[in-house]
Amino acid sequence: MSDLGRVVVLAGGLSHERDVSLRSGRRVAEALRGVGVEVDVLDADSGLLPGLALDRPAAVFPLLHGAQGEDGAVRGVLELLRLPYVGATPAASRTAFDKPVARALVAAVGLAVPEGVVLPHSTFRELGAATLLDAIVARIGLPLVVKPARGGSALGCAVVRDPVDLPAAMVSCFAYGEDALVEGYVTGTEVAVSVVDTGSGPVALPAVEIVPDGGMYDYEARYTAGETEFFVPARLDPAATSAVADVAVRAHRVLGLRDVSRTDLIVDEAGRPWFLEANVAPGMTETSLLPQSVVAAGLDLGVLARDLLHLAVARSADVGGPAGPAG
């Protein structure tokens, strides 16, 4: 058995991405058990906090996706309980989860981002949808990508190639949040680059190239086996391979992330990477991207997860340690 002690994987929750989170949690828990770690999977429901306070684990691996999970809320609670946990701080999580804020920060250090505009639902309703959407098309051009300003798993996302489809795409997007981010569509190769840091600084894992059968890497394409073809490492030339790794590590640093992250990019025909978003709780399901990168790097998911938990415990000790014994 591991000397780590009992750990908890947090999964589930109440967001639209609950099912994905549960699948991620089961996958990581299985991997940890495979390397001798005692692990419980806990759902983030109303009984979570009393349970954590009463039976304190040595550390927590949060795998909650979407609101409350990736927006820093639950991580803030873990800090209040003085429980060591894997991943970004509450503040950094909020920054990465808010796509417009993350875009602005990475653009400020010279990373390429698609042209975009944030449109609140209230503005969409009150100022007239037709006029606003016409102005967006005139400014950015077609095709457009419509996505919730906060959220993941491509829920509420759409590629709009015909302006007549834009109103419906906006309505669908607003079902997942108050603000929509409308971006110019970048033609190229879609890749995801995972970054891990087990104590020696952030390192990019091999990039995953994503080729969905239906043309868009939507929720179904992400989590249904056989719906998407993946190439690991991505079929990029050496210069582009180096460039996407550099962008992912720089984004990880600029956004203040730690331990693990995943950056989604498009590499255009000239080999230039365009930043789309960064994720503080990358999916860990059987079709998710980070586990594929881990295998391609010659690593073991259980060993990596265990090392990240050890790092969280050491970090906690450096700042005063947990309140009370770990059970």
Predicted regions mapped to residue ranges:
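ATP-binding N-terminal substructure of ATP-dependent carboxylate-amine bond-forming enzymes
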Residues: 1-104, 108, 120-134, 307, ...
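Active-site nucleotide/adenylate-binding loops and adjacent lid/helix of ATP-dependent enzymes
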Residues: 1-11, 54, 95-189
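Hydrophobic beta-strand scaffold residues
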Residues: 39, 84-85, 113, 144, ...
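A short glycine-rich, hydrophobically flanked beta-strand micro-motif that places a catalytic Asp/Glu
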Residues: 40-45, 184, 192, 256-270
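Short, flexible, mixed-charge acidic loops at enzyme active sites
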Residues: 73-80, 217-224, 280
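ATP-dependent carboxylate activation and anion-phosphoryl transfer catalytic cores
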Residues: 110, 237-327
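Phosphate-binding site of ATP-dependent enzymes
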Residues: 158-246, 267, 272-274
